Amino acid sequence: SKALRLKREILLANPVLDIDKIIVGRYKIGTTARQVNPRALGTQNNNWSNQTSASRGGFNAEIAELSNLRGDIKTRTIFKPNNGSSVPDLKLHWDAERLMFSMVDTDKRWQVFEVKLDGTGLKKLIETPEKDLEFFDATYLPSGKIIAVSNIGYNGVPCVNGNDEVGNMCLYDPKDGSLRRLTFDQDANWAPTVMNNGRIMYTRWEYTDLTHYFSRFVMHMNPDGTEQKSLYGSGSYFPNSTFDAKPLPGHPSQFIGVISGHHGVTRSGRLMLFDPSKSRKSEKGMLQELPFRDRKIEPIVKDRLVDGVWPQFIKPYPLTDKYFLVTAKLDENSLWGIYLIDVYDNLTLIAEFEGEGLICPIPVKKTPIPPVIPDKITPGSKEIGRAHV
């Protein structure tokens, strides 16, 4: 045990933790905290739905700051809903002074909010006269605009008779309140994230005329919605789903993501490093699985891809190209805690609390703002467009 303590001290001495502050979603669950899946931490109900299908109440949740990461963890509440809402979709602004998140509003509809890290300045970020619209899963843009997922299409997932609403992406400009739909997909978009080059990566579920158990691909596009292209997974049966994709700092192509199934385990799964410049299909562009660098990645074609697989990971955050924060549950009797994981197979606990679950770790530090990609469209223009097939 002395050797293990020493190992832990050495791993936590890593300079990547000099930030000494992490933002998390904190969920007080109670005696079932070791048995719950990510639904209890505010995520979607399954791998084909978005936030409109998630629970809208009954949570004891807050956005918290963890500090003193190498010792006895200190906690500070940044924001706590007073209506029992969860607080998913945490995104820290590049200035590290404010963050956005999703929360159920007074009318029980999902909306995107912002709060300063000192707990002040709570405000709704997207205002629209369309009272039926809900917004969630949003991200800041370098231009000052916002991309959010919304129920704007008023359509549902076919195989559940439309009972789970589909979320497509919208572009919102806080300066003039303009809202424009970016994607017109039959099924869901998830997790828009700004890449290092200013483009947007996201997961798209393709459904029509294919085996939709295996078709949640990583896409990328310009912030104005133009040039939507596959980034990883198109034309492959493995993996079924890639969630929570985030670019590695300073790298032009590599990203980290969680692969999961269709039915079965919800939202969490195996942690993978990808490089589309190596390949864009199946396991061929996967650099390694964390924390199993020497284990061959087999392209398993299976509906419930990660059922019975441990550890389970969700919501990774790259600190460098080798070190990452991640939410993990190590086995079926473990808590959902925050870990430091690296490409050398080390998995080090930073924080967990009995009776609770922690999710979505984000380091409190300023980060470079990606370049602004100018709009390539003129809304309202009547010029004829041409498409080549």
Q: What are the residue ranges of the model-derived segments?
A:
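Long amphipathic alpha-helical scaffold segments
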Residues: 1-77
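Residue-level detector of Asp-centered blade-edge/turn motifs that repeat once per structural unit
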Residues: 17-18, 94-95, 141-143, 195-197, ...
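Hydrophobic beta-strand positions that form the internal "hydrophobic ladder"
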Residues: 22, 99, 146-147, 200, ...
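Short, conserved, GDST-rich strand-edge loop motifs in beta-rich repeat architectures
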Residues: 27-58, 104, 109, 148-165, ...
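Beta-propeller blade signature
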Residues: 61-67, 113-119, 163-176, 215-226, ...
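Multi-bladed beta-propeller domains
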Residues: 71-85, 116-134, 172-187, 222-241, ...
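Loop/turn-rich, solvent-exposed surfaces of beta-rich toroidal or solenoidal domains
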Residues: 203, 247-339
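Conserved small/polar residues in nucleotide/adenosyl-binding loops
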Residues: 387-389
